[in-house]
Design a protein with these regions (language model features):
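Long, low-complexity, Lys/Arg-enriched
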Residues: 1-103, 111-348
Length: 348
């Protein structure tokens, strides 16, 4: 097994690996530790002690089970441009890099969106383009996500960029002159405390129609209502969102989010086809679970030569609520495992 995780201060960094190893079995387990820096001025640098603690825990967990290999990701080009998503997409370039393993596990619990989205897409692409009787057909690809909505709210984006960008490789078709006149439909997955990001993405996309996604049902039955209250003036007064345009999906089921968003896109494509076509942009501003659902939508449509954009706003780092460090030595929440490709997947 190859276990892939990102280095960081998030207390969930090693929880998935710990649960997996404690479940038993003596098979070989190697780890790939993704390393990246948001810059010397990043507020995340203040939590270096938490990072060291997580790395020490990783080394202790691995013990004699296998090796730990570090793979760096560049977040900025020489010109100062953000290239994290493109770098993440190039982390693995060939299916043969997974030779000797039966399972790949990617734990995104402590991984930024700009890194895990293109990385998931790249691994799926490597597996899908591999012939049925070759190495890729024998690999299982699993995704681990430790969901803790309270902790997510306590880790805030700091230094949000002034403009939004499209996550590589989901955005190249959005600015084509040949389709400039096509209506744009924007589908943002709403989460708490994301007003600046919503405003910047709206400025990038300039949509003709907006279909916000609300987490409902949710562990907190009023979470969807609270999000509507939080963004009421933005959604209804400024962006003129129609109440009938809201999409609802369970906050703990990315495959339901996938189905609901896919259904909405197909409906709009059929309705707008007399106008010469349409464009769609997704924005995952919610939990990692729902973000995965949005990514799978874009991935599957791209496989059929239909480009779906994913718009995102980068940040300079993250701020961790100090009370969390003092009062929450242990994480709450729950580990989710998604089996995205492998033995169950008949690709013939």
């Amino acid at each position: 097994m190859l276990f892939i995780l990102a280095k960081g201060f998030d207390p969930r960094m090693c929880l998935g690996l710990e649960k997996l190893l404690n479940a038993g079995g003596n098979g070989k387990c190697d780890a790939v530790l993704i390393e990246f820096s948001e810059g010397t001025s990043s507020p995340s640098n203040a939590y270096w002690q938490l990072v060291d603690k997580n790395v020490a825990k990783l080394e202790k967990l691995m013990g004699q089970r296998g090796t730990i290999a570090s793979r760096p990701i560049k977040t900025h080009s020489k010109e100062g441009h953000r290239i994290a998503s493109r770098s993440a997409s190039n982390l693995f370039k060939d299916i043969n890099e997974f030779a000797g393993y039966t399972d790949i596990v990617l734990d995104i619990s402590a991984t930024p969106r700009a890194v895990y989205m293109p990385l998931i897409a790249k691994i799926l692409h490597l597996l899908d383009k591999t012939p049925r009787n070759s190495l890729g057909a024998q690999l299982n690809f699993h995704l681990f996500v430790w969901e803790d909505s309270d902790l997510d709210r306590d880790i805030r984006d700091e230094g949000v960029e002034e403009s939004a960008v499209y996550v590589h490789p989901y955005g190249g078709a959005m600015d084509r002159e040949a389709t400039a006149g096509q209506p744009k439909v924007w589908i943002p997955l709403l989460g708490e405390g994301q007003r600046p990001q919503l405003e910047r993405i709206h400025a990038l996309v300039v949509p003709d129609e907006i279909c916000p996604v609300l987490p409902s049902p949710a562990l907190n039955p009023r979470r969807g209502d609270n999000l509507v209250v939080e963004y009421h003036d933005l959604l209804f007064d400024r962006l003129r969102v129609e109440p009938r345009n809201f999409i609802y999906c369970s906050e703990r089921n990315p495959f339901e989010a996938y189905r609901q968003i896919t259904r909405a896109i197909r409906g709009y494509r059929n309705s707008l086809s007399p106008l010469g076509g349409s464009k769609f942009v997704l924005s995952a501003l919610s939990s990692k679970l729902l973000s995965v659902g949005a990514l799978l939508v874009a991935y599957d449509f791209k496989a059929t030569n239909i480009d779906i954009g994913i718009a995102h706003v980068e940040c300079h780092g993250y701020y961790l609520n100090e009370t969390v460090q003092e009062t929450r030595p242990q994480c709450r929440g729950e580990l989710f495992g998604l089996w995205l490709a492998g033995e169950w997947d008949d690709r013939d």
